[in-house]
From Swiss-Prot:
Belongs to the zinc-containing alcohol dehydrogenase family. Quinone oxidoreductase subfamily. Changing M43I: In OPA10; uncertain significance. PANTHER family: ALCOHOL DEHYDROGENASE RELATED, RETICULON-4-INTERACTING PROTEIN 1, MITOCHONDRIAL. InterPro entries: ADH-like_N, GroES-like_sf, NAD(P)-bd_dom_sf, PKS_ER, Quin_OxRdtase/zeta-crystal_CS, RTN4I1, YIM1/Zinc_Alcohol_DH_Fams. It is linked to Optic atrophy 10 with or without ataxia, impaired intellectual development, and seizures: An autosomal recessive disease characterized by progressive visual loss in association with optic atrophy. Atrophy of the optic disk indicates a deficiency in the number of nerve fibers which arise in the retina and converge to form the optic disk, optic nerve, optic chiasm and optic tracts. OPA10 patients may also manifest mild ataxia, mild intellectual disability and, rarely, generalized seizures. One of its GO terms (biological process) is ubiquinone biosynthetic process. Residues 52-393 form the Enoyl reductase (ER) domain. Transmembrane segments: none annotated. NADPH binds at S214, G216, V217, S237, Y255, N276, L300, A341, F343, H386, A387, R388. NAD(P)H oxidoreductase involved in the ubiquinone biosynthetic pathway. Required for the O-methyltransferase activity of COQ3. Able to catalyze the oxidoreduction of 3-demethylubiquinone into 3-demethylubiquinol in vitro. However, it is unclear if 3-demethylubiquinone constitutes a substrate in vivo. May also play a role in the regulation of retinal ganglion cell (RGC) neurite outgrowth, and hence in the development of the inner retina and optic nerve. Appears to be a potent inhibitor of regeneration following spinal cord injury. This is NAD(P)H oxidoreductase RTN4IP1, mitochondrial. GO terms for cellular component: mitochondrial matrix; mitochondrial outer membrane; mitochondrion. Changing G321E: In OPA10; uncertain significance.
C-alpha cells in the first residue's frame, strides 16, 4: 500500500513538472508573414469592375487599403502615377487570361475575382510601412517603382509592392517627374541590357536604330544609348524630330515623308535595333542589321498575351513557342539575332537608372499631367496615340 502511494505521488509530481515546462519553458512559434492586420479602412482609387471602353473606369472612395501579406513587402503612399499604353489595353481586357493565371495559378478563385481592379503601373511616393524582412527601406523614404501588371495598380492613395521591385527615388526629380520613368525605363532596359546584352562597357560606337522613338520607351532608350556612347538613329514623325534630337539622336528619319526602308538604305547597317512599333516592321527591319556580327533585333510588340487570350493557356503558350522559335531560327540563318523582350520589374535596375538620372544623363520626358480627378481624360489621351513622352497623374 505504501509503495502504491509513492508511485502515485511521483506520477503527480512528473505531471506537474511537465505542465510547468509546457507553460513556462516552451515558447510559442511565431509566423513571420505580415506586419499588418486586416483593416476596415478604405482609400480613394480609380478601378474597373469589368473590361471595356473608357466608361468602365470608376472612381471610388471605398477601395480597401492594401495590407502587407509577405515579409518582403512595403506599402507606399502614392504621390504621382502615370498612364501607359499597357493600362489602356488592360482596361479593355488585354492579357486577362495570362494575368489571371499569374494572380491565381491554382485556379482557386472564380472568374471575375480580379475586380475591382486598379490600373496604373508607375508610382513615386513615400514608404508608409515595411515588412519584417525589408532592410533597405524605412517609413518616410521617398521611392519609385513599377508594379507588375498582375498586381493591383497605382491609381490609388496607397499601393503595396515587393521590396525587390522598389528603389530610392532619384534625388534630382520631383515625384511627378519620377512617376514618368519606371515602367518605360524598365521595359527599355529589359530590351537593351537584359535581352540585347548592351551596357556602358560594350556600347561605345555601336550603331543603334530605334523604331517608335518619340514615346515613353523610345525617349528613354535614346538617352540611355547616348549615355553609353552609341550612335542613335531615331524613327518618328516630323513633329517629334526636334524632341528626339534634343535627347541626343544623331540621325532622325520621318516615317511620314516616305518609305522608312528606302530612307534606311542610305545609312550604314546597325548593330542593334529596338522595335516599339511592331506589325510589318519586323518583316524588313532585321535586314538592316550587320550580318554575322552578333547584331540583334529586339521587338517589344509580341503576340504572347494575345495568343493566350485567343487560344487559352496551353495552346497559347505552345503557339507562342513555335512562333518565336521559328522566327529566331529563320533570322539565325541570315546571320542576325531575333529576340522578344518584355517589361521586368526590378528595384536593382531602377537603382542603376537613378544613378544615370542624378548624373544628368537621363531626364524625364512628360507630355502632359492630369490631376487625380481626371484619370479618364488621361486614358483617352494615351489611347489616341502619337505620344511625345509620358502622361502623368498627380495623386497628391
Amino acid at each position: 500500500m505504501e509503495f502504491l502511494k509513492t508511485c502515485v505521488l511521483r506520477r503527480n509530481a512528473c505531471t506537474a513538472v511537465c505542465f510547468w515546462r509546457s507553460k513556462v519553458v516552451q515558447k510559442p512559434s511565431v509566423r513571420r508573414i505580415s506586419t499588418t492586420s486586416p483593416r476596415s479602412t478604405v482609400m480613394p482609387a480609380w478601378v474597373i469592375d469589368k473590361y471595356g471602353k473608357n466608361e468602365v473606369l470608376r472612381f471610388t472612395q471605398n477601395m480597401m487599403m492594401p495590407i502587407i501579406h509577405y515579409p518582403n513587402e512595403v506599402i507606399v503612399k502614392v504621390h504621382a502615377a502615370s498612364v501607359n499604353p499597357i493600362d489602356v489595353n488592360m482596361r479593355s481586357g488585354y492579357g486577362a487570361t495570362a494575368l489571371n493565371m499569374k494572380r491565381d495559378p491554382l485556379h482557386v478563385k472564380i472568374k471575375g475575382e480580379e475586380f475591382p481592379l486598379t490600373l496604373g503601373r508607375d508610382v513615386s511616393g513615400v514608404v508608409m510601412e515595411c515588412g519584417l524582412d525589408v532592410k533597405y527601406f524605412k517609413p518616410g523614404d521617398e521611392v519609385w517603382a513599377a508594379v507588375p501588371p498582375w498586381k493591383q495598380g497605382t491609381l490609388s492613395e496607397f499601393v503595396v509592392v515587393s521590396g525587390n521591385e522598389v528603389s530610392h527615388k532619384p534625388k534630382s526629380l520631383t515625384h511627378t517627374q519620377a512617376a514618368s520613368l519606371p515602367y518605360v525605363a524598365l521595359t527599355a532596359w529589359s530590351a537593351i541590357n537584359k535581352v540585347g546584352g548592351l551596357n556602358d562597357k560594350n556600347c561605345t560606337g555601336k550603331r543603334v536604330l530605334i523604331l517608335g522613338a518619340s514615346g515613353g520607351v523610345g525617349t528613354f532608350a535614346i538617352q540611355v544609348m547616348k549615355a553609353w556612347d552609341a550612335h542613335v538613329t531615331a524613327v518618328c514623325s516630323q513633329d517629334a524630330s526636334e524632341l528626339v534630337r534634343k535627347l541626343g539622336a544623331d540621325d532622325v528619319i520621318d516615317y511620314k515623308s516616305g518609305s522608312v526602308e528606302e530612307q534606311l538604305k542610305s545609312l550604314k547597317p546597325f548593330d542593334f535595333i529596338l522595335d516599339n512599333v511592331g506589325g510589318s516592321t519586323e518583316t524588313w527591319a532585321p535586314d538592316f542589321l550587320k550580318k554575322w556580327s552578333g547584331a540583334t533585333y529586339v521587338t517589344l510588340v509580341t503576340p504572347f498575351l494575345l495568343n493566350m487570350d485567343r487560344l487559352g493557356i496551353a495552346d497559347g503558350m505552345l503557339q507562342t513557342g513555335v512562333t518565336v522559335g521559328s522566327k529566331a531560327l529563320k533570322h539565325f540563318w541570315k546571320g542576325v539575332h531575333y529576340r522578344w523582350a518584355f517589361f521586368m520589374a526590378s528595384g536593382p535596375c531602377l537603382d542603376d537608372i537613378a544613378e544615370l538620372v542624378d548624373a544628368g544623363k537621363i531626364r524625364p520626358v512628360i507630355e502632359q499631367t492630369f490631376p487625380f480627378s481626371k484619370v479618364p481624360e488621361a486614358f483617352l489621351k494615351v489611347e489616341r496615340g502619337h505620344a511625345r513622352g509620358k502622361t502623368v497623374i498627380n495623386v497628391v
